[in-house]
Protein backbone atom coordinates (compact mmCIF):
# COMPACT_ATOMS: atom_id res chain seq x y z
CA UNK A 1 0.00 0.00 0.00
CA UNK A 2 1.42 3.34 -1.03
CA UNK A 3 1.15 6.53 1.00
CA UNK A 4 -1.24 7.90 -1.62
CA UNK A 5 -3.50 4.84 -1.31
CA UNK A 6 -3.38 4.85 2.48
CA UNK A 7 -4.33 8.52 2.65
CA UNK A 8 -7.06 8.22 0.04
CA UNK A 9 -10.16 10.11 1.09
CA UNK A 10 -8.20 12.65 3.10
CA UNK A 11 -7.60 16.22 1.88
CA UNK A 12 -4.76 16.24 -0.65
CA UNK A 13 -2.88 19.01 1.15
CA UNK A 14 -2.05 16.66 4.05
CA UNK A 15 0.69 15.22 1.84
CA UNK A 16 2.13 18.72 1.37
CA UNK A 17 2.58 19.31 5.09
CA UNK A 18 6.14 18.83 6.36
CA UNK A 19 6.94 15.30 7.46
CA UNK A 20 9.65 14.20 9.86
CA UNK A 21 11.95 11.19 9.99
CA UNK A 22 13.33 9.95 13.29
CA UNK A 23 15.56 7.10 14.36
CA UNK A 24 13.96 4.92 17.00
CA UNK A 25 16.51 2.70 18.80
CA UNK A 26 13.74 0.46 20.13
CA UNK A 27 12.33 -0.08 16.64
CA UNK A 28 15.83 -0.94 15.43
CA UNK A 29 16.47 -3.30 18.37
CA UNK A 30 13.26 -5.24 17.74
CA UNK A 31 13.50 -5.16 13.95
CA UNK A 32 10.40 -3.02 13.46
CA UNK A 33 12.10 -0.65 11.01
CA UNK A 34 15.33 -0.81 9.02
CA UNK A 35 17.99 1.07 10.96
CA UNK A 36 15.16 2.21 13.23
CA UNK A 37 14.23 5.01 10.84
CA UNK A 38 10.56 5.90 10.65
CA UNK A 39 8.81 8.75 8.87
CA UNK A 40 5.78 10.46 10.34
CA UNK A 41 3.34 12.51 8.30
CA UNK A 42 0.57 14.91 9.23
CA UNK A 43 -1.99 12.28 8.23
CA UNK A 44 -0.62 10.09 11.05
CA UNK A 45 -1.49 12.80 13.57
CA UNK A 46 -4.96 13.10 12.05
CA UNK A 47 -5.51 9.37 12.45
CA UNK A 48 -4.35 9.54 16.05
CA UNK A 49 -6.62 12.46 16.94
CA UNK A 50 -9.48 11.32 14.74
CA UNK A 51 -9.75 14.79 13.24
CA UNK A 52 -7.77 17.66 11.75
CA UNK A 53 -8.00 21.08 13.35
CA UNK A 54 -5.80 24.09 14.16
CA UNK A 55 -4.82 22.47 17.47
CA UNK A 56 -3.62 19.25 15.82
CA UNK A 57 -1.89 21.27 13.09
CA UNK A 58 -0.26 23.53 15.67
CA UNK A 59 0.90 20.58 17.77
CA UNK A 60 2.40 18.99 14.66
CA UNK A 61 4.32 22.11 13.70
CA UNK A 62 5.43 22.96 17.24
CA UNK A 63 6.89 19.50 17.77
CA UNK A 64 8.61 19.47 14.37
CA UNK A 65 10.17 22.90 14.80
CA UNK A 66 11.18 22.12 18.37
CA UNK A 67 12.99 18.96 17.25
CA UNK A 68 14.69 20.79 14.40
CA UNK A 69 15.95 23.39 16.85
CA UNK A 70 17.33 20.65 19.10
CA UNK A 71 18.91 18.45 16.43
CA UNK A 72 19.70 20.79 13.55
CA UNK A 73 20.62 18.75 10.49
CA UNK A 74 20.91 15.53 12.53
CA UNK A 75 18.06 13.04 12.64
CA UNK A 76 16.09 13.27 15.91
CA UNK A 77 16.14 10.20 18.15
CA UNK A 78 12.71 8.96 19.14
CA UNK A 79 12.46 8.00 22.79
CA UNK A 80 15.36 10.26 23.75
CA UNK A 81 13.39 13.49 24.12
CA UNK A 82 11.40 14.67 27.13
CA UNK A 83 8.19 16.59 26.47
CA UNK A 84 7.11 19.22 28.99
CA UNK A 85 3.54 20.52 28.82
CA UNK A 86 2.92 23.88 30.47
CA UNK A 87 -0.62 23.12 31.61
CA UNK A 88 -2.37 20.26 33.41
CA UNK A 89 -3.32 17.25 31.33
CA UNK A 90 -7.04 18.03 31.60
CA UNK A 91 -6.66 21.72 30.75
CA UNK A 92 -8.21 22.81 27.46
CA UNK A 93 -6.49 21.25 24.44
CA UNK A 94 -3.35 20.24 26.36
CA UNK A 95 -4.16 16.54 26.03
CA UNK A 96 -4.55 16.77 22.26
CA UNK A 97 -1.26 18.60 21.85
CA UNK A 98 0.50 16.12 24.14
CA UNK A 99 -0.86 13.16 22.16
CA UNK A 100 0.58 14.50 18.92
CA UNK A 101 3.92 15.25 20.59
CA UNK A 102 3.94 11.72 22.01
CA UNK A 103 3.27 10.22 18.59
CA UNK A 104 6.29 11.96 17.12
CA UNK A 105 8.78 11.83 20.00
CA UNK A 106 7.72 8.59 21.70
CA UNK A 107 7.68 10.39 25.05
CA UNK A 108 4.98 8.89 27.27
CA UNK A 109 3.58 9.65 30.73
CA UNK A 110 3.77 7.20 33.62
CA UNK A 111 1.64 4.72 31.67
CA UNK A 112 4.22 4.37 28.88
CA UNK A 113 6.60 1.54 27.99
CA UNK A 114 8.81 0.75 31.00
CA UNK A 115 11.72 -0.62 29.03
CA UNK A 116 13.42 -3.96 28.47
CA UNK A 117 15.25 -5.90 31.16
CA UNK A 118 16.42 -4.85 34.59
CA UNK A 119 18.14 -1.79 33.13
CA UNK A 120 14.83 -0.66 31.57
CA UNK A 121 16.47 -0.08 28.19
CA UNK A 122 14.45 2.01 25.75
CA UNK A 123 11.98 3.09 28.45
CA UNK A 124 9.49 5.73 27.34
CA UNK A 125 7.50 6.24 30.53
CA UNK A 126 7.77 9.46 32.55
CA UNK A 127 9.14 11.36 29.55
CA UNK A 128 5.89 13.31 29.11
CA UNK A 129 5.31 15.74 31.98
CA UNK A 130 2.29 17.95 32.57
CA UNK A 131 2.02 21.13 34.62
CA UNK A 132 5.47 22.52 33.86
CA UNK A 133 4.20 26.00 34.63
CA UNK A 134 7.50 27.81 34.18
CA UNK A 135 7.29 27.43 30.40
CA UNK A 136 6.77 30.55 28.32
CA UNK A 137 5.53 28.39 25.46
CA UNK A 138 2.86 25.73 25.14
CA UNK A 139 5.36 22.90 25.33
CA UNK A 140 9.02 22.24 25.93
CA UNK A 141 11.35 19.61 24.48
CA UNK A 142 14.57 18.44 26.12
CA UNK A 143 17.24 16.09 24.79
CA UNK A 144 18.18 13.41 27.29
CA UNK A 145 21.73 13.10 25.98
CA UNK A 146 22.78 16.76 25.99
CA UNK A 147 20.21 18.38 28.25
CA UNK A 148 19.56 21.04 25.62
CA UNK A 149 15.98 22.26 25.78
CA UNK A 150 13.64 24.55 23.88
CA UNK A 151 10.18 25.93 24.46
CA UNK A 152 7.67 26.41 21.67
CA UNK A 153 4.80 28.86 21.40
CA UNK A 154 2.03 28.96 18.81
CA UNK A 155 0.33 32.17 17.68
CA UNK A 156 -2.77 30.96 15.87
CA UNK A 157 -3.87 34.51 15.12
CA UNK A 158 -1.35 34.56 12.28
CA UNK A 159 -3.87 32.42 10.36
CA UNK A 160 -7.32 33.64 11.48
CA UNK A 161 -10.71 32.24 10.61
CA UNK A 162 -12.34 33.93 7.60
CA UNK A 163 -15.23 36.29 8.34
CA UNK A 164 -17.63 33.79 6.80
CA UNK A 165 -16.98 31.45 9.74
CA UNK A 166 -18.54 33.88 12.23
CA UNK A 167 -22.01 32.99 11.02
CA UNK A 168 -21.34 29.39 9.98
CA UNK A 169 -19.64 28.03 13.09
CA UNK A 170 -22.49 28.64 15.58
CA UNK A 171 -24.99 27.06 13.19
CA UNK A 172 -22.76 24.04 12.58
CA UNK A 173 -22.05 23.49 16.28
CA UNK A 174 -25.71 23.86 17.29
CA UNK A 175 -26.89 21.45 14.61
CA UNK A 176 -28.91 24.10 12.78
CA UNK A 177 -26.79 24.25 9.62
CA UNK A 178 -28.05 22.86 6.32
CA UNK A 179 -26.14 20.19 4.41
CA UNK A 180 -24.69 22.85 2.13
CA UNK A 181 -23.67 24.98 5.10
CA UNK A 182 -22.03 22.00 6.81
CA UNK A 183 -20.05 21.26 3.66
CA UNK A 184 -18.91 24.87 3.49
CA UNK A 185 -18.04 24.83 7.19
CA UNK A 186 -15.83 21.76 6.73
CA UNK A 187 -14.20 23.33 3.67
CA UNK A 188 -13.33 26.53 5.53
CA UNK A 189 -12.17 24.55 8.56
CA UNK A 190 -9.70 22.51 6.57
CA UNK A 191 -8.59 25.53 4.57
CA UNK A 192 -7.36 27.17 7.76
CA UNK A 193 -5.46 23.99 8.60
CA UNK A 194 -4.01 23.97 5.09
CA UNK A 195 -2.77 27.51 5.45
CA UNK A 196 -1.09 26.57 8.73
CA UNK A 197 0.66 23.36 7.67
CA UNK A 198 1.46 24.34 4.08
CA UNK A 199 1.56 28.11 3.55
CA UNK A 200 2.77 29.01 7.05
CA UNK A 201 4.64 25.81 7.94
CA UNK A 202 7.93 27.71 8.25
CA UNK A 203 6.45 30.95 9.57
CA UNK A 204 8.47 31.89 12.66
CA UNK A 205 5.85 34.43 13.69
CA UNK A 206 3.33 31.60 14.07
CA UNK A 207 5.59 28.92 15.59
CA UNK A 208 8.08 30.55 17.92
CA UNK A 209 10.98 28.52 19.34
CA UNK A 210 13.30 29.75 22.08
CA UNK A 211 15.89 28.27 24.41
CA UNK A 212 14.70 26.83 27.71
CA UNK A 213 16.72 26.41 30.88
CA UNK A 214 15.67 23.26 32.74
CA UNK A 215 16.84 22.78 36.31
Residue ranges and their predicted role:
Residues 1-52, 61-215:
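Non-transmembrane, aqueous-exposed alpha-helical and coiled segments at domain scale
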Amino acid sequence: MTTETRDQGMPAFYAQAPSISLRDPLAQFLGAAQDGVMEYRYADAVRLAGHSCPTVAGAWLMTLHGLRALYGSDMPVRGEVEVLMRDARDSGVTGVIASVAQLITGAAPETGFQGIGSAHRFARNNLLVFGAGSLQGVLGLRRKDTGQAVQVRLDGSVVPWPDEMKALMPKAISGQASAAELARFAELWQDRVRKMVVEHAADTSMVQVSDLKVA
